[in-house]
Amino acid sequence: MTNRLPPSLYVPPHQRLGSDYGFNPVPLSPVRYVSAYDDRVSEDRQPQEGTFHCADLDDWNKRFSMLLKDSLKQEVISREKKDRRDFDKLAALATTLGLYSHAYAKVVVFSKIPLPNYRFDLDDKKPQREVNLHTDLLQRVEAYLTEYLSKSSNRIDRVPANSVSRTSSISSTDEWFSEQPLPISATKILWQRSLQLRDRQQYWQASVEGQRMLDSRTSLPAFKQRHSVLTAISQNQVIVISGETGCGKTTQIPQFILESEIEANRGAFSSIICTQPRRISAMSVSERVAYERGEQLGESVGYKVRLEGVKGRDTRLLFCTTGILLRRLLVDRNLRGVTHVIVDEIHERGMNEDFLLIILKDLLSRRSELKLILMSATLDAELFSSYFGGAGVIYIPGFTYPVRSHFLEDILEMTRYRLTPYNQIDDYGQERTWKMNKQIPKKRKSQITFVVEDALRAADFKEFSPETRESLSCWYPDCIGFNLIEFLLCNICENEGPGGILIFLTGWDDISSLKEKLQIHPIFGNPDLVMLLACHGSMETFEQRLIFEEPASGVRKIVLATNIAETSITINDVAFVIDCGKAKETSYDALNNTPCLLPSWISKVSAQQRRGRAGRVRPGQCYHLYPKCVYDAFAEYQLPEILRTPLHSLCLQIKSLNLGSISEFLSRALQSPELLAVQKAIAFLKIIGALDENEDLTTLGRYLSKLPMEPKLGKMLILGAILGCLDPILTVAAGLSVRDPFLTPQDKKDLAEAAKSQFSRDHSDHLALVRAYEGWKKAEEESAVYDYCWKNFLSIQSLRAIDSLRKEFFSLLKDTGLIDGNPSICNSEGNDANLTRAVICYGMYPGICSVVHNERSFSLKTMEDGQVLLYSNSENARETKIPYPWLVFNEKIKVNSVFLRDSTACSDSTLILFGGSISKGDTDGHLKMLGGYLEFFMKPDVAEIYQTLKKELDELIQNKLLNPKVDMQAHRELLSAIRLLVSEDGCDGRFVFGHQILRPLEISALSTKPSLFSRTESGPGGDNSKSQLQTILTRAGYTVPMYKTKQLKNNKFQTTVEFNETQIMGQPCSNKKSAEKDAAAEAIQWLKGGAKESHEQVNHMSKLLKKGKKDHL
C-alpha cells in the first residue's frame, strides 16, 4: 500500500506504464479495444448465463492483491464477458480493497486511482482519419512552399534589438490606478489639495442637506460603531468586519475611512480601493456614497468596471470589481500609493476574491503601512480572521423589520393552491426543454431531487390537510414553479399591502421566460399597475439603474433577479420575497475535465439573506417554494468558486504575476483546490502553448497574460491580428464574452429560428455571429437599428456590448504592441471566411470533436467525454449532415449529457495546420495530435508538406510575437500556400477504425511467418482480425460482416462469417471469441490474394470487393 498514488492524482491513460490488458499480454501485437459506441460490431448471441463461483472470486482477489503490491502497475483491464457480467460483484470486492472500478462497455477496469467516465485508449472508434487531397491542389501548394523555402536564406525576420517596439507598461485599464511618483516640490500641492478636500467636506457636513443626510446615516447600525471601526483600523493592519445585511457596512465603512483621512489633512495622500464582486455593485454603491457626500461621481468618489468608469483628479475612494484590482497588480505588485484596500462580500468566496486574498497576504509583509479591511455579510468571519493570523473581528448587527417565512407546505395550506404533475412544468418556449419537462416522471432523478430525497422521505406533514399532503407528494423539485409564482403574485396584489416584490430565480433563462409569461398577464403586463423589471449581472447600466427607482404612486415594483440581489445590491422598497431555493452555478468535474452547469440548492446562509431582503423598510414576508424539511437539509455555506471551476485562467494570472510555482501558490489559499484540478489547468496551458514544460510563460503566454479574457479568446485575437483578419475575430471574441444576441421568444420560436438561418451559413455559429453584427452596424449607419433587431430577433443590448468589447479588445491589443492601431493593416484578409475559420480553430483548440456520419445523421465525440451533443440553439444542431470531419467548440457543459456550445466546422487541413502540435507517428504518412487521440493517415509526401507548413507557420507566429515589426508580406508564399489548403480542402478523406500500425520490429518478426493474418490469438492480426475485416469491407462500401457461431459436440465453437453474399467458415476453437477471430482471419486470407506488402494487400482486397459489388449491381 505504500506505493499507491494519492487518490487525487490522475495519470492519462496514454502516459501510464503498467497496465495489464486482459492478463495475456502479447508484446508485439496491437491490442483491439471496443467502446460503448461500437454499435456496428455484430454479436448474434448473448453471453451464456453462468454463475459466479467462489473460485472466480478467489482468483480476482489474488489479482487485486498483486496489483496493489506492484509499484509499476496502476490498473487491471479485462475484456472477458464473464467479468463484465459479474462486474458488480467484482467492483464490490475491489472497493473493499481500496481500488476503483469502472465498466466501459466491453471493458472493465480496476485501478488504484479514480477512473474517468470515458477512456479514449479503450475506444476502438477514436478518431482515425485518412486524409485525401487532390493532386492539383497539392502541386499548387508545393509550388508556393518551394518558392518560399528557396527565399528563406535571404529573409530577415528580426530587426535589431534596439529598434524593437516597446509596449507600454501600463495599459488603458491600469491608468485608472496609476499613481505617478511626485517630486518633493509637489508635496506642497498635495497639502493644498488636502486642505481643499477638508474644507469641501466640512462645508457639506454643515449644510442643511448635509445635516439631513447625516441624520439618515446615523440611523444605520454601522454608523453607531464608527469610532470602534476607525480605532481598530488605526491599530491593526488587518481587520474583519462581519455585518448583517442592511447594517450599512458597504456604504459607510469606506466613507468612515475617507472622512477620517480628509479630516486629518491626509486626503490627497490617501488612496482607498474598495472591491466589489460585481460591476452593478461597484457602480450603484459608488453613486450612493457620492450622493451621501453631496458630490458628483468623479470628485472624491469614483468607480471603475470593465468598459466604463468615472474618476477625477481628486478621487480618493475608488469602487471597482476585483478583476480590475488584479489588473493593477500586473503592473504594480506593491500597489504604490494605495493606503487602504477594502475587500467587500468576501463571504461569496468568488475565485478572484480568494486569489486576491493570497496576494494581499503576501503583500502585507512588504507594505507594513497598508491597511486591509475584509467585509462579510455572514457569520463566518473567524475563517478569514484565522487566515490572516488572528486578525481582529468587529461584528455589526443588522436592522431589519420582522419577516414572516412561508415554506411550500404553508403556502399550499393558506392559499389552497394544488400541485399536479402538469401545472409544475416551466415553459421556456423551447421545444426540447418543453419535451424534457413533459417526460419528467420517466426521467431518472436529477441531482436537485437526489439531495433532498431523504429529507422528503422523513417528513410526514401530519399537521397539514390531506389536500396539502397530496400536493406535496407530487412536488417536483427540479421545477422553478412559474405557475405557482404567478398565483402568488396575484395573491399578494389582491390581499397584501403595498411594497415591492423580489423574485429570486436561477438565471437569465428563468428571468426572461417568466418575464414574458407575466407580460401577457392583464395585471402584471400593465405598466400603469406594475413596474416589471429584471436584475442580472450582464445587463446594461441604464437597465440596472431602473431597479433602484421609486415606482409611481399606485404602481407595484416586481423585480426578477438572480442571487446578485442577495447581498451585492439593496432594493429599498421590497416588502415581499419569493425564493425558488436554487441558483445556477458552475461545478467542475476535474476527473473528467468537464464543467457542469446545473441548478443547485442554495445554502442556509443564502436563504437567510434572501429572506432578509423583505424587511428593509417595513415588516415583510418571504415565500420559499420548497418545504421546510428541504431547507433543513441545505448546506450551511456555499462551496467556494475556486473549488468548483476550471483554473486555467487563474493559473495564467499566477505566472504573469511571477508568483512562483502554481501548485505551491494555490496551496496557500484559504481553501486550496484539489491537486488534479491544478494539474488539468497546467496541462491545458501547455497544450495551447501558454506554458512550456517547465511551467514558465512562453512568448505567447506573456501576451495572453496581458489580455483580461479567456486564454482561447486571447489566442484568437493574437492570430487574427497577425494574419490580417482581426475584424471578424474581434466580433467572435466579444460575442463569446456576452449573452447570446440571438433571441428565441417562446411564442415566436419558428420565426426566430428562420431569422437566424439568414446568418447561418458554412456550418459555423461563430460566423453567424459575425454576420449578425455586421448587419447591425450597417443598420446603425442607416438609423434602422431597432427595426433590424426586431425583424431578426436580435438583442440590441448584446450587440451594443459586443461593439463596446470590440473597442476594448482592440485597445488592449494595441497596448501589447502587436498592432499599431491602423485597422487596414490588421484587416487585409478580413473577408476571407476560410482563414477566419482557421483562426477560430487556433483559438478553440483543444476543444475539438470528430463528426462521423451514419445513414441518418452523425455522431460527435471528444477526447475526454466520448459521445457528446450540440446545444439546440446551435446552427449545426439543426443539420442532418455536416460536410466537414471536425467541429471546434467554445465550451462544453454537462447537464445530463455533455453539450457543446458555439461550434464551427473545419477541414482536415485546418485542424492539422491550426490545431496543436503534431508529431510523427509510427510509420511514414502517420501523424498524431493530442497525445495520440487524433490520428491522421496519408501519403508520406502529403504528411511532409503538412509538417513543413506547420513548422514554418509556428516559427512565423513566434517571430511576429517577438518582434511585431516583422513584415508579413515577406512571407506571402507561405501564407498563400496555407490559405490555399484551408480554402480548397474538400474533406475527401474518411474515418477508419482499428487502423493498426506495424512497427519495424513487428514487420521484421513477421517476415518469417507464412501469413500476415494469423488465426492464433498470440499472432499479429489475430487479436485484431475482426477489426481488419470490418475496415476492409467499410472501405469497399459494404456493411459490417455478420458472425454466426455454433457450439460443436466436443464443446468447441465454430464461426461462419458472412459478407457480400459470401460465407467463410473458420476452424473450431475453444471459445466463441477465438472462433470469430479465426473466421475473420480466414476471410482476410481468402481476400488478400497474391499481394505481398501489407498496404498492397488492403488495396487488392478493396478492389476485389468493389469489383464484386459492381458486378453484382
UniProtKB/Swiss-Prot annotation:
* Single annotated GO MF: ATP hydrolysis activity
Q: Where is this motif: DEIH box?
A: 344-347
Family listed: Belongs to the DExH box helicase family.
Give the CDD domains listed for this entry.
DEXHc_RHA-like, SF2_C_RHA
**What sequence ranges are listed for the domain Helicase C-terminal?**
484-658
InterPro entries from the entry?
A: DEAD-box_helicase_OB_fold, DEAD/DEAH_box_helicase_dom, dsRBD_dom, HA2_WH, Helicase-assoc_dom, Helicase_ATP-bd, Helicase_C-like, P-loop_NTPase
Tell me what this protein is called.
Answer: DExH-box ATP-dependent RNA helicase DExH5, mitochondrial
**Domain Helicase ATP-binding, residue spans:** 230-397
Report the subcellular localization: Mitochondrion
Q: What is its EC number?
A: 3.6.4.13
Point out the signal peptide segment: none
Q: Which reaction does it catalyse?
A: ATP + H2O = ADP + phosphate + H(+)
Q: Which PANTHER family match?
A: ATP-DEPENDENT RNA HELICASE (PTHR18934), DEXH-BOX ATP-DEPENDENT RNA HELICASE DEXH5, MITOCHONDRIAL (PTHR18934:SF146)
Please list the residues that bind ATP. G243, E244, T245, G246, C247, G248, K249, T250
Primary place of residence? mitochondrion
The record ties this protein, via Gene3D superfamilies, to: 1.20.120.1080, 3.30.160.20, P-loop containing nucleotide triphosphate hydrolases
